[in-house]
């Protein structure tokens, strides 16, 4: 989708319906800059090209595997995005993904609508 962040690999019938700049908490000491993409099937994260070269990972989850969408309070971890409230995704396998995004409440509403969770 751009020079800074590569276009996500999509299925043949898949289209991006929404996207937003985001930082993904990849570990307790690292947040990776990039972009969140929403399709009618999945939520995906693509790291920016610099973070991808230095070990930043892409991520994806089918919408049906997102069990919860909420706000994670700041935890004080400066290098993993923990100085701000973050988007929290609880997944069906019990894992948690955290993302720093602007307009957090709007993002939560958008993803809740897409996953069929109460807005």
Question: Model-predicted segments: where are they?
Answer:
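Short acidic, Gly/Pro-enriched loop/turn segments at secondary-structure junctions
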Residues: 50-53, 68-85
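Short acidic, glycine-rich loop/turn motifs
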Residues: 47-49, 89-93
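Short, well-ordered, aromatic-rich surface patches in folded extracellular/luminal domains
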Residues: 111
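Eukaryotic short linear interaction motifs
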Residues: 45, 52, 97, 107-108
């Amino acid at each position: 989708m751009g020079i800074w962040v590569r276009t996500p690999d999509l299925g043949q019938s898949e289209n991006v319906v929404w996207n937003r700049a985001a930082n993904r908490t990849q570990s307790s000491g690292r947040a990776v800059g990039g972009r969140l993409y929403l399709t009618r099937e999945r939520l995906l994260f693509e790291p920016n090209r610099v973070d991808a070269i230095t070990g930043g990972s892409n991520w994806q989850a089918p919408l049906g595997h997102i069990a919860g969408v909420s706000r994670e309070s700041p935890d004080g971890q400066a290098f993993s995005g923990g100085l701000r409230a973050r988007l929290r995704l609880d997944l069906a396998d019990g894992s948690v993904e955290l993302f720093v995004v602007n307009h957090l409440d709007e993002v939560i509403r958008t993803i809740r609508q897409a996953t069929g969770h109460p807005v």
